Amino acid sequence: MRVGIKVLGCPKNEADCEVLAGVLREGGHEIVFDVKDADVVVLDTCAFIEDAKRESIDEIFSFVDAKDQYGYKLVVKGCLVQRYYEELKKEVPEVDQWIGVADPEEIANAIENGTDLVPDQPETVYRYRKRIDLEERPYAYVKISDGCDRGCTFCSIPSFKGSLRSRSIEDITREVEDLLKEGKKEIILVAQDTTSYGIDLYRKQALPDLLRRLNSLNGEFWIRVMYLHPDHLTEEIISAMLELDKVVKYFDVPVQHGSDKILKLMGRTKSSEELKKMLSSIRERFPDAVLRTSIIVGFPGETEEDFEELKQFVEEIQFDKLGAFVYSDEEGTVAFNLKEKVDPEMAKRRQEELLLLQAEISNSRLDRFVGKKLKFLVEGKEGKFLVGRTWTEAPEVDGVVFVRGKGKIGDFLEVVIKEHDEYDMWGSVI
């Protein structure tokens, strides 16, 4: 059977699908990269917020429309199916098979048998199997846990991903060792909340132990940690990230807001002052540390005063990178039942205003790198430039660096930064 896989949504989905591809190949199936060549197309979906759901549904219909032309069987899997299985099955009968959130081996067996698979509640997290690159790139996302126990009032993820389930340090290490042997130069650790890693398995926050283990592996590579929940970003985690040489000093901390009133409504426990103190302490210890965050605007009850507090918070912290999202009213969450909904047009205006403010801040923050030498990872070529990233950018969510010089994908080069705009930098190989 020839199987094509299309991934939507977050990096955790990408990691899942590369593991699934490996399981399918171990079972004797061929992984193809063009749907025209596939007997079966697996579409992995996202259901986090309204925009992601809409994109997933649009892609489902796009693949349904192409079925007759290419003659493949269509399997739709992932978070959207786990959350809306009965509705989807009724509304889109053209889909051949529906699969929710499950273990890769269970998914592979279901695909082979042609049966739907939607667990009542996801209870497993995959054990490492040899994975297959679905894209040529020098980095890999490694999922260290699945599910979440945090209970943010705006978030629907626990309802379809289940409670926290951590992989063992040994299992993750085996996966990373294989990825390094294959030539990966950056290992990006992902989860719904990386700070919670190990609480279920080791009865403690085990991220520092995991980082120390991975840092001890041989080779030249970066370790990047994403999705650090601010309420549980401890001094031990911060110290490990700052002290270990292969861990990049990049802190992805989704604070979500800067108004104490809104933070409380969101179910967050740290106040804005506590957040400022924590983030400032990182910069005091490592001035060039990169701080990235995510913000939700238009949360129920957000007034102009709250929004002004948010802007003041952002200006004071001076985040290097910031993603701003309009609140998505998700059925089944605590926030769904909150009154005082913000007008969508008002929320959109606030998003645009915040992003304009952040563009100025990002531009100013990049000034410190002009004239500096930075390690650069080659990811491709665009015209006369090599394209890639330094340790200061995460893939897909941040800007890129354009460099004049010679190199190939996966090379680490030393470059000097010459100029920048709000998001991207330009330099040359030394």
From Swiss-Prot:
InterPro entries: Elp3/MiaA/NifB-like_rSAM, Methylthiotransferase, Methylthiotransferase_CS, Methylthiotransferase_N, Methylthiotransferase_N_sf, NA-bd_OB-fold, Ribosomal_uS12_MeSTrfase_RimO, rSAM. SUPFAM superfamilies: Radical SAM enzymes. It is found in: Cytoplasm. Its cofactor is [4Fe-4S] cluster. GO terms for cellular component: cytosol. One of its GO terms (biological process) is tRNA modification. One of its GO terms (molecular function) is 4 iron, 4 sulfur cluster binding. Residues 1-116 form the MTTase N-terminal domain. It comes from the Bacteria. Binds 2 [4Fe-4S] clusters. One cluster is coordinated with 3 cysteines and an exchangeable S-adenosyl-L-methionine. PROSITE patterns: MTTASE_N (PS51449), MTTASE_RADICAL (PS01278), RADICAL_SAM (PS51918), TRAM (PS50926). The keyword Signal does not apply. The keyword Secreted does not apply. Residues 367-430 form the TRAM domain. Its EC number is 2.8.4.4. Residues 134-365 form the Radical SAM core domain. Pfam families: Radical_SAM, TRAM_2, UPF0004. [4Fe-4S] cluster 2 binds at residues 148, 152, 155. HAMAP family: MTTase_RimO. Belongs to the methylthiotransferase family. RimO subfamily. This is Ribosomal protein uS12 methylthiotransferase RimO. It comes from Thermotoga petrophila (strain ATCC BAA-488 / DSM 13995 / JCM 10881 / RKU-1).
